[in-house]
C-alpha cells in the first residue's frame, strides 16, 4: 500500500503531479482589426474567443446576451411579468447580469424582457472586517449598484427585513443582526464550517426577503466556473444529496420562491470581454472572501478548479455539465412551515428541539432527509455506544450479548426511534 499521504504535497495535494498541457490553450485573443467578423462579414473583428471564430463588438454582445436570454426562454420557468428579486454583489459577473437585464428592458416590445426586477444587496461585509473598513466597502458597492437605476433594497445576512438603498441611516442599520451573526459564526472552529454556514444563511436570507417583497423568483449571477466549484465542494462536504439543486438552473426546494441561475452558461472569458466592449462603462468590485487564506475544503477545491480553468478550460465545463445529469429528491414544506424558520435560532443555546417533529426536510439547508437506514450513521452511532457501554471487566458472553443489543439500538436511533434504557444503558 502506498505510504505517501496528502500532507507530503502541502496544501496543493498531488496536483503538482498532473502534467500541464504545453502550450496552454489561449482563452481569447484580440485581433488586429483587419480581419472581418465571421458572423456579419461587415464589421472588423475585435476579439476571438477560445474555439470560436473572430467576432466584431456587436456580434459578440448579441451572442452573450442571447445565451442569457436563451436560458430563460428555453426553460419557461419565469413567467411573463413576474417580480424577480435580483441579487446584487458587485462582482464582475453580477454587474454583467444587471446590465443584460437593463438592456433587455430597453428593447422593443417583441424583444423586451418581460420581468419586473427588484434588486437587493445583502451585505456580508461585516464578516472579518472592522467597522470602518465595512463602511467603505458598503459605500463602494452602493455606488456601483446605483449606476443601474433599479428599485433597490439593502439588508444584511441573517436579517429578516430590508430597507431602500436611499435610506439615510443605511450604514448604521442592522447593528444587532451583525453582532448576532458574528457571535454565532465565531463559535465555529474550522474555516470549512464557517464558509458553509455563510452559504446556507445567505440562501435563507434571500428567501425571507423574496417573501417580504413578494418575488416568486430569485436571480443569482453564478457562472459555470462558480458552479463547478460548488459541485466539487459539495461532494467534499458530504452534500451530495442536494448537489443537483445547488448547481441547477432552477432550485425549486421552495416552490414559492425559486432560485434561478440564468448566467450558468457563461464563462469568465465572456464576462471579461463583455465588460470591455459593453455599451456603457461598467464599474465592479473584486469580492474578497474573509477566509480565503484559511485552510478549508472550499478553498482547496477553488484553487484546484481555478488551476483547471487556466490550463484545461474544457475540463471545467465537463465538471459543471456533469451536474446536469444528476437528479435530486425534493420535499415540500410541512405544516410546520419551516420556511419561516429563523436559521440563526438553530444555533441558540436556549433552543429546545421538538422531539415529536415530523419534518422530512433539513431545517438548515431544506434538503430531503436521508438518515433512514444510513450505514454511515449506523457505524458512527454503534461506535459511540461501544465506547460508552462496554466495560473491560465484562465477560465475553456479556460483551457479545451487549453488542447485539447495541446494534439494534443503533439502528433504532439512526431511524429516529426511541431507544429503551436511555443514553448510557
UniProtKB/Swiss-Prot annotation:
GO BP annotation list: protein urmylation; tRNA thio-modification; tRNA wobble position uridine thiolation; tRNA wobble uridine modification
Keywords linked to the UniProt accession: Cytoplasm, tRNA processing
InterPro entries: CTU2, Rossmann-like_a/b/a_fold
Species of provenance: Culex quinquefasciatus
Protein name (database record): Cytoplasmic tRNA 2-thiolation protein 2
Compositionally biased intervals (Acidic residues): 1-11
One Pfam family this sequence matches: CTU2
Sequence segments annotated as region (Disordered): 1-22, 404-425
The keyword tRNA processing is annotated on this UniProt entry: yes
Gene3D superfamilies, per the entry: HUPs
Biased composition (Basic and acidic residues): 13-22, 404-416
Biological pathway: tRNA modification; 5-methoxycarbonylmethyl-2-thiouridine-tRNA biosynthesis
Amino acid at each position: 500500500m502506498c505510504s505517501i499521504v496528502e500532507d507530503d504535497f502541502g496544501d496543493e495535494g498531488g496536483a503538482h503531479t498532473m502534467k500541464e498541457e504545453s502550450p496552454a490553450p489561449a482563452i481569447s485573443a484580440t485581433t488586429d482589426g483587419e480581419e472581418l467578423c465571421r458572423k456579419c462579414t461587415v464589421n472588423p473583428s475585435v476579439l476571438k474567443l477560445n474555439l470560436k471564430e473572430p467576432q466584431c463588438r456587436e456580434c459578440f454582445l448579441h451572442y452573450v446576451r442571447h445565451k442569457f436570454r436563451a436560458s430563460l426562454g428555453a426553460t419557461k420557468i419565469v413567467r411573463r411579468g413576474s417580480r424577480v428579486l435580483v441579487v446584487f454583489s458587485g462582482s464582475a459577473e453580477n454587474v454583467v447580469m444587471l446590465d443584460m437585464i437593463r438592456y433587455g428592458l430597453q428593447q422593443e416590445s417583441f424583444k423586451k424582457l418581460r420581468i419586473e426586477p427588484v434588486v437587493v444587496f445583502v451585505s456580508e461585509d461585516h464578516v472579518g472586517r472592522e467597522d470602518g473598513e465595512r463602511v467603505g466597502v458598503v459605500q463602494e458597492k452602493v455606488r456601483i449598484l446605483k449606476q443601474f437605476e433599479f428599485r433597490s433594497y439593502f439588508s444584511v445576512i441573517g436579517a429578516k427585513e430590508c430597507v431602500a438603498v436611499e435610506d439615510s441611516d443605511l450604514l448604521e442599520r442592522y447593528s444587532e443582526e451583525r453582532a448576532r451573526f458574528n457571535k454565532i459564526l465565531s463559535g465555529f472552529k474550522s474555516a470549512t464550517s464557517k464558509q458553509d454556514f455563510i452559504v446556507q444563511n445567505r440562501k435563507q436570507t434571500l428567501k425571507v426577503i423574496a417573501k417580504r417583497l413578494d418575488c416568486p423568483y430569485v436571480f443569482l449571477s453564478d457562472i459555470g466556473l462558480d458552479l463547478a466549484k460548488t459541485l466539487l465542494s459539495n461532494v467534499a462536504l458530504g452534500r451530495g444529496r442536494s448537489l443537483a439543486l445547488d448547481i441547477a438552473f432552477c432550485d425549486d426546494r421552495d416552490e414559492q420562491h425559486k432560485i434561478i441561475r440564468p448566467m450558468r452558461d457563461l464563462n469568465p472569458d465572456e464576462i471579461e470581454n463583455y465588460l470591455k466592449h459593453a455599451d456603457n462603462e461598467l464599474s465592479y468590485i473584486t469580492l474578497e472572501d474573509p477566509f480565503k487564506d484559511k485552510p478549508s475544503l472550499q478553498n482547496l477545491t477553488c484553487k484546484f478548479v481555478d488551476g483547471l480553468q487556466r490550463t484545461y478550460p474544457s475540463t471545467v465545463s465537463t465538471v459543471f455539465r456533469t451536474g446536469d445529469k444528476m437528479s435530486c429528491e425534493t420535499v415540500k414544506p410541512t405544516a410546520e412551515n419551516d420556511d419561516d424558520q429563523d436559521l440563526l435560532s438553530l444555533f441558540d443555546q436556549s433552543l429546545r428541539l421538538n422531539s415529536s417533529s415530523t419534518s422530512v426536510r433539513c431545517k438548515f439547508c431544506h434538503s430531503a432527509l436521508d438518515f433512514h437506514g444510513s450505514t454511515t450513521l449506523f457505524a458512527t452511532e454503534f461506535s459511540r455506544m461501544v465506547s460508552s457501554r462496554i466495560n473491560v471487566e465484562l465477560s465475553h458472553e456479556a460483551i457479545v450479548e451487549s453488542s447485539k443489543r447495541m446494534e439494534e439500538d443503533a439502528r433504532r436511533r439512526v431511524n429516529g426511534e426511541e431507544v429503551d434504557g436511555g443514553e448510557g444503558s
